[in-house]
Each structure stands twice: as C-alpha cells, then as structure tokens.
Amino acid sequence: MLSSKRPVRTLIAAALALAALPAMAADPAFNRTVFFGDSLTDSGYFRPLLPPSVQPVTGKFTTNPAWVWAEHVADYYGTNATPNGNGQSGDNYAAGGATVATDLVGALGPTPSLKTQAARYLAANGGKADGNALYTVWGGPNDLFGITNPAQAPAVIGAAVTNQIGIVGSLQAAGAKYVMVPNLPDIGLTPMARAGGPAAMAQYTAVATAYNNALYGGLTQAGIEFIPLDTFTILREIVASPTTYGFRNVTDMACTSASSVTCNPTSLVAPDAATAYVFADGVHPSAATHQMLGQYAVSVLEAPRLQQVLTHSAQTIGHSRADQVSLHLGGAPADGLSWWGGVRGDMQRYDHADLYDGLAPAGLFGIDWARDGMVVGGFAGYGRMDADFGNSQGDFTQSDTTVGLFAGWYGERAWVNGQVSYSWLDYDVTRKVHLGPATREHKGSPEGSNLTAALNAGYEFGQEGSFRHGPVAAVIWQKVKLDGYLESNPSSTALGYSDQDADSTVGRLGWQARLDGGSIKPYVQVTYDHEFEDRQDGSAFLQSLPGVGSYRVPGLKFDKDYATAILGARMELFGLQSNIGLSATTMQKKAMDTSIFASFSGAF
C-alpha cells in the first residue's frame, strides 16, 4: 500500500522543480532600428568607395573609427545600424551630404536624399514598415547650408520641413508606429559658424531654431505622432559646461583633415582629441559627443518604460497580498471573533536585474467573525519596497497603505473566499541619465492607488488517511493608478509623465494538496496563471519642448502565462495558529517573483 505522504511529496517535488526553471521579463523595446539621415547619422555609406587600405579607420563623419550615435542606439537594442548603400545592406540608410528631398552628386558620389532613402527602404520591404521597429528621420542641415541669401531661408526651410513631415507620414502610413525625429543641433555653436564671427553664429542659430519650430509645429499640426529628441538643447548644455562632460575644447576641430570622413587616429590634433573635443571637424560631432547623443536617445526611449515598472511592482505586491489574505484561513474557523496578523517579504527580480530588482517587507493585520463556516472580516496593512532600476538607471521606493474586506465560506470539502482592498501608493523615484562621464539625476514623488478584488475557490476530493487534494481556481483583478508628475532638474533630459492606469486580470487554475494529520500540516499549491490584459504603450514628454506634447514607446512586455507554486505548513507556534510558507512564480523568461510569508492567528 502506498504511503499517504507520497502524493504530497510528489507534488512538492514538482513545485520545487518548477521554481528552479529559468525565467524572462520585458523584451527589448524594438526588434529593428532603421535610420534615414545625413552625415550626423551616416555609419559608413561611402566607405566602400574609399581606398581599401584606409576603410577600417575611415568612412564616417566623426573621429573614426568611432561609432556614430545611431550605432550606440542599435547596440543597446541588439539591432542593426550598419550602412545601406554602395553594396552594403544594413538598416542605416543615412548618407553624408544628404538633403531632405533632393538627390545630389557629391565629391564621393551619388548622395540619396532622405526621401529617396525612405522610398528605397519601403520598396525593399514590399511597401510596408515594421510596426515593432524604431525609425529615425533626421535631416535638414544640408538644406540650410545651401542658403546663400537670408531671404531664401523661409522658402528653403518650408520646402525641407514639408518634405520631412511627408517622409514621417509615409512611414506611418506604411505601418510604422514609432518614428524618432530629432531636431537640429545649434549649428551656431560649430567651429564652422564660429569662424564667421558672432554674426554668423547668431544667423546659424536662428535658422536652426526656425527649422526646429517649423518641423515640430508642422508634425503636431498634422496630427502625426513622433518621438522628439532635443539635440539643440543638449548640445548647448554640453558646450556651456564642457568639463562636466569630459571636454576641454568646444570651439575647435579634433581632426586635421578637411573632412572628418577621412579623419582617423593619425590625423587628430592630439591623441585624446576624440574624447576631449566636442567637434570632429567644422560641423560634425566627435566620438564622445556621438556617444552622449546615443545615450540621450536611449534615455528618452526607455524612461517611459521605467514608469511602467512602478505600476507593475504595485501589481506584483498586490498579487502577493491577495494570496496572503486568501490563505490566512486553512479551513472552517471556530465560531466567534478572531484576529490574525502576518508579515511578508516580497522579492522582485526581472531580466537578471537589468530591468529592476527590489525587496518589499510588508505587514497585515485582520479581524474575522465566523459562524457555521461563514466568515466576514477586515484587514489593514503597510509595506515598503526599495528597488533599483537596471543598468544604473536609478532607483525607487514604493510604500503602500492598505485597507480591505474579506468574506468566505468553508465547508467540509469545498471553500470559497473573496476580498476587496484599496491601497494608497507613494513613490520616490530617481532616474539617472548617463552622458559620458557625467550622470544627471531626475527625481519625482508621484502618488497612486491600487484597487484590488480577488475571488478564490477550491474543492477537496476524498480522504486517504490524512491526505487531501483537489482543484483550485482564482481571479485577481487590479486597477493601479499612478499620478502624473514632472521630474526635477529641468533640462534636455528631464521628462514629464501624464496619469497612468494599469489594469491586471489574472486567472488561475491548479491543484492543491495537504496533510491534515500531525502537529505540522504541510501543503502545496501549483497553478497555471494567465494575464488577460494586454500591455500598453509607455508615454512621456520632454520638458524642454513643452509645445510638442507626449510621445509613445512600446510598453514593457511581461509574460502573460506562467506558473505559481506555494509551499507552506500550518502549525501551532507559541500557542498561536501559524501559517509559514514560500510563494514563487516561474516559467517566465528571466523573471521571478518570490514571497516569504508568516501568519499568526488567535481567538479573542
């Protein structure tokens, strides 16, 4: 005859095996990065036309062989920013010297405009754009450089802006959802402009400003959604405080060659010029400046997603709290008034902590009144989470104060209980933006709430000695609200956020087993959990561009299907009824939520 303990041992072993499986969290925001632009984005369009002997250390308009900003962005997302053109087939179509809409023939050969670049991309992809890709359309400087008379400026700017808006519109019409449109940097700060004196500097600043206002104003008026990038302001900030960012020269060129396309380590004005100078030549950024532009772009793209960590962490804590409330009774209680209290330690770790990880101790206290298997009661609790965003992107604390109601019915074999609770959420958030050797901190203290409702039920089949087992089911619904707020330290990297609503509806089906005899009564529950709500895009707005409005990026994508294993034991401890256990989610990708809990109860 089989021991009655063997089935529960088997289920416990299965639960432990599930908990040991590796898990995954949020996927990268974009599956592809496609760039259209000029020399500011060009990652080597003309390199095949240069002498083979120098190709490894030339071909970009910077302090070669450094990366341009687009390559830094692509590297972050694990995508492609290699050149497309002159026999190359990457996703960076940008070509040095390109205007917005007019194809040219330059010193290095034919130069396709941004309009032609985008048309070639669409033609190569069946006229369709990838809705999960990031597109960048950055142009305009070469159109401005073609102005020979100030009177031409309005017409030139108007034509270029109209065509650039048309490019963005055509990409979105083809299916693109996320198009980044950087504005022009302050050309008046370049060595080329400085060579013309204060009047030339002012003139170039004025035309860049006019272009930027027309571009963003036109996109907004046309109702076209886009992701802005304020390169105009960030370049000003770098030039205004060069030592903060590791520079010692903001006025001169790092390269001795006439054009940075042939600049290489042997043609620098100093061995460290690639990192000590802001500009490579008369108009193009150095290696260090490109790195900072890439870091800036990534910060703008990722910050809205970090805000979704705040709502997700609240939902995860709410889930653990709902489980603890549901499990505080192991069966029909004695008639009368009783109390219960519990402590819990939640650990959240996502993407091996590259997304975020944190610890959240919490406490609960409740009072129940029971008669003939019916139970009603209330509870209250408090918890605090200290967490770090991954990749040194900052940290946050989250506190929750909760009140709730509980009701249940416990029969000989079946049981059902329900609860509803409301939590007041308070956050202190620090987001860090790394720009070369400098780190900016932006802080905020938003408030929020979590309305939770849960229904749990189970049934136990016959009895084999002291062994009981049967199916369980549950639904946990949560609505988390996060108030909008403005980050501190207003600058090009500071963002603002509108109110967020994050809904979660988790359905759960599984099996439970327990041993009812003896002084220690172990139990195990293993369930398949499914999240019914779809992810939402993240959104934010740049404080330095108040008239542009909010932009959207893909939201964090958490697993919709996973397993939860709960292992515990009920016993009498210090004269009190006790429930001590561990809960862990698994079968996720690079993610695990773990909770250690202990509850105690007694009669009044």
Label for each model-derived stretch:
Residues 1-27, 407:
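Gram-negative bacterial Sec-dependent N-terminal signal peptides
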Residues 35, 94, 136-140, 342, ...:
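Short beta-strand segments
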Residues 339, 404, 408, 497-604:
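Outer membrane beta-barrel transmembrane domains
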Residues 25-336, 343-351, 572:
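Conserved active-site regions of diverse hydrolases
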Residues 150-154, 191-204, 244-258, 262, ...:
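Solvent-exposed, glycine/polar-rich loop segments of beta-barrel outer-membrane systems
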Residues 464-470, 480-484, 518-522:
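Short, structured loop/turn "capping" segments at alpha-beta junctions
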Residues 211-215, 397-405, 453-455, 504-514:
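Transmembrane beta-barrel strand/turn architecture of Gram-negative outer membrane proteins
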Residues 308-469, 477, 581-595, 599-603:
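Outer membrane beta-barrel translocator domains of Type V secretion systems
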